[in-house]
Amino acid sequence: LHKEYRRQRQMCIRDRLYTKNSRMKDPEYINIGDIQLIEQRQNFHVRIDPPGGDLGDYIPFYFGGHSPMLLNIKTGYRGIRKRPQDELIYIVCRIKDIVAQCPAWCFTDGHAKNKLTEFYNDIKDLTHVDWEVVCTQFWGNDEANMDRMRRKQAEFLVKDCVPVSCVAGIIVKTADREAYVKTILSRLSIEIPIYVDSKNNYFYP
């Protein structure tokens, strides 16, 4: 899963998802979340080769919803600019489609910048992802699991770009936002299923 700010939707859906560093990126690209962390990631080395490079060379996907960063965006915690969740969408891709269409990718078992995190480049190693944690809404560390928050933020990283043919669906928070996205897709003559997260399976209540 990958979050996009709404002003970025039309360009990324029409063409491809590009990294922040790409010369093909949307000129109106807007960073959301922790700007300092985003900048730190640009030159943070990916600890597996292939595919190698830095995190700034990759498009990051979460495996599930309710990320810690989304909560920070919702609440404005840690000085992060507060935004309504309705301004965000999830762009959903299937791993099998990315593997088939994107030549360079890897994934982690936790937050990519954490020293404890391992990187993998073999689909067989998806067993190292803590699927119970990445799919839960409640991810805080406690005495029972002091590593839950790191594991919650496991990432699938795709190098350079992701073609729109990999987009299996779009998740929005409200019916109003569904109508807005439908208008964009219709204008671009693109058919992508849209799902309203009425039960808060991905967005926070």
Predicted regions and their residues:
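Short hydrophobic-aromatic micro-motifs
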Residues: 6-7, 61-63, 91
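Glycine-rich loop/turn
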Residues: 14-60, 65-83
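Residue-level signal for well-ordered alpha-helical segments
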Residues: 11, 38-48, 144-149, 158
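Conserved NAD+-utilizing ADP-ribose enzyme module
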Residues: 15, 54-57, 69-205
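Short, flexible, glycine/charge-rich loop motifs used to bind or transfer phosphoryl groups or to couple energy/partner
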Residues: 1-2, 49-50, 160
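Surface-exposed loop/turn and secondary-structure junction residues enriched for glycine/proline
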Residues: 4, 20, 33, 38, ...
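Single conserved hydrophobic/aromatic residue that forms the stacking wall/gate
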Residues: 1-13
